[in-house]
């Protein structure tokens, strides 16, 4: 196995504006902070001004409810919000289905698909992913049903910019997939935003230990 160092992302559920104060506490501990704005019951586009100074280390996510989001977000508002983020050069994570329907820009952004109930065939994943060659990363999260490991490994074998995540499994599996080529590993800072996330401090410690082992001279 070739050891590949993924970027560590801490997912931060933003339920109140005061939760944004945690950004400054986290950005020096991890590579990126994901702001899950769909946890807010209401906000407007000007919320971007509150954390624009951190944009180089942020991923902004407004997840649709049918793809794992918490609160309903009006699609027209979301499309406008995403275009504002594009203009202001924020990194964002957008669902493939939404990106196609509303023709939002995905160049150098993260495009994602989620399967909570069924495991897709690889051909279905490929058909979707191949529409987003300009994306920075192509991400897939799947329920841990029979065959999910084989599916996710095939995605990694076919896409150099893939992020793969099994849901509802031991968090160590997420680390394993990141070592096999998944570009990001998501963790939490006290509250999971997806089943199977480990605390970011545990992930960081494990990755550091593996890095030390792999960089040590063979005996």
From Swiss-Prot:
Pfam families given in the database record: DHquinase_I
The keyword Lyase appears for this protein: yes
InterPro entries: Aldolase_TIM, DHquinase_I, Type-I_3-dehydroquinase
Enzyme active site: 114 (proton donor/acceptor), 139 (schiff-base intermediate with substrate)
Function of the protein: Involved in the third step of the chorismate pathway, which leads to the biosynthesis of aromatic amino acids. Catalyzes the cis-dehydration of 3-dehydroquinate (DHQ) and introduces the first double bond of the aromatic ring to yield 3-dehydroshikimate.
Organism this protein belongs to: Sulfolobus acidocaldarius (strain ATCC 33909 / DSM 639 / JCM 8929 / NBRC 15157 / NCIMB 11770)
Reactions this protein catalyses: 3-dehydroquinate = 3-dehydroshikimate + H2O
Superkingdom classification of source: Archaea
The protein's name in its UniProt record: 3-dehydroquinate dehydratase
Family (UniProt): Belongs to the type-I 3-dehydroquinase family.
Subunit-structure text: Homodimer.
């Amino acid at each position: 196995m070739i050891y590949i160092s993924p970027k560590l992302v801490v997912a931060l559920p933003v339920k109140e504006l005061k939760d944004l104060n945690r950004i400054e506490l986290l950005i020096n501990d991890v590579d990126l902070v994901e702001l899950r704005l769909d946890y807010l019951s209401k906000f407007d586009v000007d919320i971007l001004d509150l954390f624009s100074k951190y944009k180089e280390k942020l991923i902004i996510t407004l997840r649709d409810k049918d793809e794992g989001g918490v609160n309903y977000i009006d699609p027209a508002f979301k499309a406008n919000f995403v275009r504002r983020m594009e203009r202001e050069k924020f990194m964002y994570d957008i669902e493939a289905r939404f990106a196609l329907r509303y023709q939002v820009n995905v160049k150098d952004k993260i495009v994602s698909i989620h399967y909570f109930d069924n495991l897709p065939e690889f051909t279905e994943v490929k058909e979707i992913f191949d529409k987003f060659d300009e994306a920075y990363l192509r991400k897939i999260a799947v329920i841990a049903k029979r065959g999910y490991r084989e599916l996710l490994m095939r995605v990694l074998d076919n896409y150099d910019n893939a992020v793969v995540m099994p849901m509802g499994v031991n968090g160590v599996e997420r680390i394993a997939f990141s070592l096999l080529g998944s570009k990001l590993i998501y963790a939490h800072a006290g509250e999971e935003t997806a089943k199977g996330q480990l605390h970011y401090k545990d992930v960081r410690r494990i990755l550091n230990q593996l890095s030390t082992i792999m960089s040590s001279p063979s005996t």
